[in-house]
Amino acid sequence: MAGIGFELKKLFQKRGLAATAKAYGYAGVICTGPMLLGIVLLVGIAFICDHTGATRHNRELLNCMITYTLLASLTVTSFFSMVVTRYIADMLYEERHEAVLSSFWGSTALLLVVGGIMYGIFLLFSGINLIDQFLCLEFFGELIVTWNAMSYLTAIKDYKGILISFITAVAVSLLVGFLLILIGIPHVEALMIAVTIGYGIMLLWDVTLLYR
């Protein structure tokens, strides 16, 4: 979060209650965006399930799949976050911006391979069907890239753009999930597809910001 921290520091230097509240608000939403999106999606999914006749088993299965995947991705990326943050700070200090982007893809590939193997083994013994295993693994991969990208975002000023990406991701996920259920796709698969689409939107947005 080095780059985010540098820019948020400028907001905190501004005086006034409104400026301070704005800085804290941006810091909270930006740094916890993926997890916040997960919580909102879980609430939205529960609402959709209640109004579309989903069984209790399906609701609990969805909650477990999403929660376990979130926790697994956070656990894997946490082992690298401190090293990544220190490296970003050093490269920015030395004004070697090209090294930051190249290391992003290198660290992302490493996290995807190591994390994907570990989580893939877990899914094999989880007891869920093959389609759900694939959706969970895809969701896990998106989360890995998203968490890592959040550590690499540098010199960000378009905070409103980031917030819009969060809101758009939630809206699209819930809308797509509802539509997929309406056309007859089972609840678990429909809503997992919707969640991967939602986080996919945020992933693409974050990676795009890295190249601005």
Feature names for model-found ranges:
Residues M1-L41, E60-C64:
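N-terminal membrane topogenesis motif
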Residues M1-T20, S151-A155, I181, Y199-R212:
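C-terminal transmembrane helix end/exit motif
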Residues A27, A99-V100, D158-S165, L191:
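Alpha-helical transmembrane segments and their helix-entry boundary regions
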Residues G44-L70:
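Interfacial/gating helices of multi-pass transporter permease domains
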Residues T75-G106:
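Transmembrane-helix boundary and interhelical linker motifs in polytopic inner-membrane proteins
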Residues S81, W105-I128:
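Alpha-helical transmembrane segments of multi-pass membrane transport and lipid-handling proteins
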Residues S165-Y211:
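Hydrophobic alpha-helical transmembrane segments
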